[in-house]
Amino acid sequence: ITDKANENFKWIGIIKLFLPNSIILHCERDQSDICFSIFKNNFNSKNMNWSSKPEHITRYYDLYKKMMNFWKKECGDFFYNISYENLINNSENEIKNLIKICNLKWDDRCLRFYENNTTYVRTTSAVQARMPIYSKSIGNYLNFKDFIKFN
C-alpha cells in the first residue's frame, strides 16, 4: 500500500501497532521546496487549513520534523529514508534500493511506472504520477524566494 498524503506522519504509531512488519518509506525533501509545493497547490480541505499561509505551513513542517525524529528514534528499523533529490537524480539506483527494502522482486517496469495507466491516483499529483521522473521541482521555490519565506 502506498499513500503519500501530507498528514500520514500522524498515523505512524498506529501503523506500527497494527502492521508491525511494515516499513515506512520516508522521502525527505528540501524544506522550502516542500512548503512551496503545499502552498501553491491551494488545498481546500478544512482538515488542511494550515496550508494557506506560509507561516502556518512552516510551523506545521516543524511539527512534522519533530514527530518524524521522534519516531525514527523509537523505531528506526521501521523506517527507510530516501532523499527526494537523490531519487530524482539517481532514480534507477534509488528505486532498486526501495524494491530491495520492501523485499520485492526487481522488474525493469519499475523504471517505467508511468506507463501503467491502470493505477488509481487520487492526489494533486495524479498527472505527475503518469509522467517520467523529472527534476524541474527541485529548487522551484527559488523563483519566488523574494516573495515567500518558508524557514
How should these model regions be labeled?
Residues 1-16:
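Glycine-rich phosphate-binding loop used to anchor ATP phosphates in small-molecule kinases
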Residues 10, 20, 103:
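Hydrophobic/aromatic-lined pockets within catalytic cores
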Residues 3-5, 25-28, 82:
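Generic beta-strand/beta-sheet core signal
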Residues 35-81, 88-151:
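PAPS-dependent sulfotransferases, especially Golgi type II membrane carbohydrate sulfotransferases
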Residues 12-15, 86, 92:
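Short gly/Ser/Thr-rich phosphate-binding loop of adenylate-forming enzymes
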Residues 13, 21-22, 76, 139:
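Residue-identity detector for glycine
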Residues 8, 29-34, 87-89:
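Conserved nucleotide-binding/hydrolysis micro-motifs of P-loop NTPases
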Residues 15-40, 98:
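Conserved phosphate-donor/acceptor-positioning beta-strand/loop module used by diverse small-molecule
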